[in-house]
């Protein structure tokens, strides 16, 4: 991915307010200013209406075919089997997709922002916007083109494993929360409060007994929370720059595990084993590493 200067393209459903568009762009750019601009990226903001999302998906198809003559209108535009945005009307949330694939010519990042969980009126929406940008940052340091085969598996491996959220989500969440905590007018104890809340998931993680690296999105454990604590632990050990800059700089060339060993001082299994013992302490002790 190239370093791309300038704002991302934003496309919003007709029932999305200008204030939501402005807020999304503002917090996206706070993150890109802090971590570097990567792209090209498009932000698609979904509203609350099935009618407006249908129009948005028509626009998606128009934009895709305009930018890429290889785009498959039959399968990669909204159809009876798949749609890019409809589920967000009911489910909410946000996501990043990487359209860095061998069967298309125009490669880009897609950021989809839903209308709820969190809603644009919540402070969490600001953090989620930055969280999604950190996923762009992560993927921007991986050059493998997705061919639905070996290259796809390599990209997944460099993110911490297919369907394994521990590192990718933990990194995005901690970096976003850390950056938000440093913004003007954010209360001084914000980050400790957030991490205290995430510590409620520690007991269920330890009781469940499944290794952190093996947890999937469907396991009944808040893996995002534990991953966030793991990254806080790593950052405390080696420093923010080593985690965010140096590890990712070597990720593509060395691969996940070798870059992990080089910059964090041990392999991922050993570090997680050490972390699993450390995290058994009282929460007050754990919070001492949080700035």
Outline where the language-model segments fall.
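Acidic/histidine-rich, surface-exposed loop or edge segments in extracytoplasmic proteins
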Residues: 1-18, 113, 211
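Extracellular/periplasmic catalytic domains that process cell-envelope and extracellular macromolecules
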Residues: 3-4, 37-38, 101-104, 166, ...
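Zn2+-dependent metallopeptidase catalytic core
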Residues: 11-95, 126, 130-133, 140, ...
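Active-site-proximal alpha-helical
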Residues: 31, 166, 171, 175-179, ...
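Surface-exposed patches in mature extracellular/periplasmic domains of secreted proteins
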Residues: 34-49, 145-151, 184-190, 242-249
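Surface-exposed intrinsically disordered loops and tails
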Residues: 77-101, 147-158, 208-215, 244-245, ...
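Zinc-dependent metallopeptidase catalytic helix centered on the HExxH motif
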Residues: 88-195
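Alpha-helical transmembrane segments and their immediate juxtamembrane flanks
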Residues: 273-290
